[in-house]
Amino acid sequence: MKKVHAPIHPGEVLLEEFMLPYGISQYEVAKVIGVSPRRINEIVHGKRSITADSALRLARAFSMNDAFFSNLQADYDLAIERDRLEAVLPNISVLPAVAKAMLKTAV
């Protein structure tokens, strides 16, 4: 399956959807959430993942639910790995015991 576009790093979402519209600088975000400006810079430039620690801090600062930024990161990571394993995943079959159990519940 050919991908239409590359997955969007959650740092790009942070920058484009949360920081730029409100005129918020990387320094301001870092100061408010208590992390180094370098961490925010690396996140918005796609050089660093959003950890659970960063996700919780960002969620509080931007009034989002606790899982918002970690879900963005998880979705991004899955998309990257899905692309990387594109040739492998179709060759993995359901475990026989699971397939058997699924047949029993389908009846």
Describe each region flagged by the PLM.
Residues 1-24:
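A short, Lys/Arg-rich alpha-helix, primarily the initiator
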Residues 2-7, 60, 66-68, 104:
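Peripheral/terminal regions associated with large enzymatic or DNA-binding modules
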Residues 23-42:
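Short alpha-helical DNA-recognition segment
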Residues 36, 47, 62, 73-76:
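The DNA-recognition helices of helix-turn-helix-type DNA-binding domains
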Residues 47-60:
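Short, basic-rich loop-to-helix N-cap that marks the start of a DNA-contacting helix
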Residues 71-107:
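Short, charged recognition helix plus adjacent turn
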